[in-house]
Amino acid sequence: MKRVLTATALLMATTGLASAEGSLQLYNWGNYTSPELLEKFTAETGITVTVTDYDSNDTALAKIEAGGHGFDLVVPSANYVSIFNEKGLTVPLDLAKLPNHANIAPEWKDVAWDAGRTTSIPWQWGTVGIAVDTAIYGGDINTSAVWLEVPDELKGKLNVVPEMMDIVTLATKYHGGEPCSEDLEVLKKVRDSLMAAKPNWVSMDYGATEKMANGDWAASVNWNGSSMRIRLERDTVAYGYPKEGYPLWMDSVMLLSDAQNVDNAYTFMNFIMQPENAALISNFARYANGISGSEAFMDPVMATAPEVVIPEEHKAAGFFMPTCNEKSREYMTAIWTELMK
């Protein structure tokens, strides 16, 4: 789920030696698709890729449900894969057309949200945590207290990404609840703490990579890859893993049921499961990818990056976000709607 978002953009790779013809429409999170990957794909296949950005799983879901979108592939987070499938918006994959499916790492091949990987393939995976400029705040950053009980040093300087599932879930874990909670006592604490904390936030925005790197913001609830990109430009920034609990996520590529360029979609999916090509995505976005052998082609700084390689002492607090039922989503949406007013 997760990334640094920009306004809608069209990234088109147009050069190359055509061994195939046509185009491909990819609907993906913003600032998440390597231009080098697209250029290489077009050079090798002759297929032109157009990437359209979205800013949240719910935005993508609503756009696809509305129809008439023209997209072939979408990249939802793990807890939305079953939703896309159940609504008939995506179709099972013909694995015979994906020989590189064998390159999916064993731990990502038979996952809870897609048994046997029959409807989705890995794009990137990571965590939700807190990026903090330690030159401004020197306290404990491995706690959601940083953004729910904002210390004086960070008041008016801390951003929160406007991602309902991530934010409500982090707050729920902080108050001792579980993901997708229907416990009204816990949810009241979540609602009250979010509303009390909001006046101390500078914004709820997706621009942490740029605004923390240039010093405009001092902290942000953020995704790990974005946080690494910030640190590479501003070395006083560190990434915290909330000890109360933090979500892990994986974004996966899915074939839409109304795709117009199905053959080209399969060509692209197979292409990105080649280790050296999966590494191009990771080197750009700064997340891990779930493809065996890709490590050999990745930027060496990622091999030891604390944002990418979860430190041993923080592993136990991580959990994969389940797909919430309708009632729990209603509760979260009610909290979120009030928070966003």
Predicted stretch roles:
Residues 85-92, 114-118, 229-241, 303-306:
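Ligand-binding "clamshell"
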Residues 210, 312-341:
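Conserved C-terminal helix/tail region of periplasmic/extracytoplasmic solute-binding proteins
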Residues 129-136, 172-174, 250-261, 269, ...:
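A bilobed periplasmic-binding-protein/Venus flytrap-type ligand-binding module shared by bacterial periplasmic
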Residues 21-84:
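Early extracytoplasmic/lumenal segment of secretory-pathway proteins
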Residues 80-83, 213, 219-236:
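A ligand-binding cleft/hinge motif common to bilobed small-molecule-binding domains
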Residues 256-316:
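Mature extracytoplasmic/periplasmic domains
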Residues 103, 187-195, 233-259:
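Periplasmic-binding protein-like
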Residues 70, 75-216:
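Extracytoplasmic ligand-binding site segments that recognize negatively charged/polar headgroups
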